[in-house]
Amino acid sequence: MVNPSPTPTAPPLPVVETIVKATTFVWQERNEFLTLAFPAILVLSILNTVVALMLAGDSPQDLATDAERLEAAVQAGILPFLLLIVPFAYFWTTFAIAWHRKYLLPKDQPSIGEVLTWRSRHTRFLLQAIGLTIVAVVILLVGASLAAFAPVLLVLVLAAVVSVYGRLSQVLPSAAVDHGLSFAQSWALTRGQTARLFATIAATWFPTAVAVSLAQQILALILGDSGSFMALFVRAFVGNVLGYLAVAIGVSVLSLIYDHLRIGRTPSVDMQVF
């Protein structure tokens, strides 16, 4: 494996430019996005709809006893998670790796079959993503216990989560292109860039999350409370389209950061939009 070493002369990460170029890249490659994401969006939307219909029942508020309400809440929340976590993890991993490689290895032109074939890089990528999630959860739990005494600390906790994620996240694009960075190497690679990583990731995550949430709220108003197959499918389909667009933007940001840090220059993306 080829391990890119930290570049002492790497210039500071350009925050705004990185975000703009990531968004531009997704727009430029919108046809490729549809090709790569459509299988995941379609399959997950069907599964979401089927699971929702299978588990449809009375609202927890309409049930008589606390035990019934608890059982209904578990059924409505935990069971869908357990049923969908494996296909979600599979499609998220295969798409994220394909999108990382789309930017970092532009000459690589895999077929859909090759994109969906699980390889050792997928296992490494998924395990490191799980590791990042565990680190974030631990920081949140520890921070939340401290914030109980001083609520203002919650802001610092969230900042710490984003900062640590930024420092460690370079294992993901590295795994996607078989460079094999460890968490320690990612931490070393991002030395001196913490504030800019925080600004870049925070300015990507939060507006994207707000936009997706608003779009879903608008969709819910349009479709109402209908529990029909078509209404559930449309809701799931649009939600998955928005979700994978958010993934594509986030992955593009990490790829641009990795490209910038590993070669010590500003990543170059043709800014032509059309």
Predicted regions and their residues:
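Juxtamembrane transition segments at transmembrane-helix termini in multipass membrane proteins
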Residues: 2-5, 58-77, 87-109, 167-179, ...
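Interfacial aromatic "cap" segments that immediately flank transmembrane helices
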Residues: 6, 10-46, 114-138, 163-212, ...
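Residue-level signature of transmembrane alpha-helical entry/exit and packing/kink sites
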Residues: 33, 37, 77-81, 85, ...
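N-terminal topogenic module of multi-pass integral membrane proteins
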Residues: 42-45, 49-53, 57-60, 74, ...
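C-terminal TM-helix exit segments that contain a strictly Trp-centered aromatic cap at the helix terminus
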Residues: 47-55, 140-144, 208-219
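Short, positively charged
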Residues: 73-74, 160-162
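Solvent-exposed, amphipathic alpha-helical "stalk/arm" or coiled-coil-like segments used as scaffolds
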Residues: 84, 88-97, 120, 124-128, ...
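Short hydrophobic membrane-inserting alpha-helices and related fusion/pore-forming segments
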Residues: 141-156
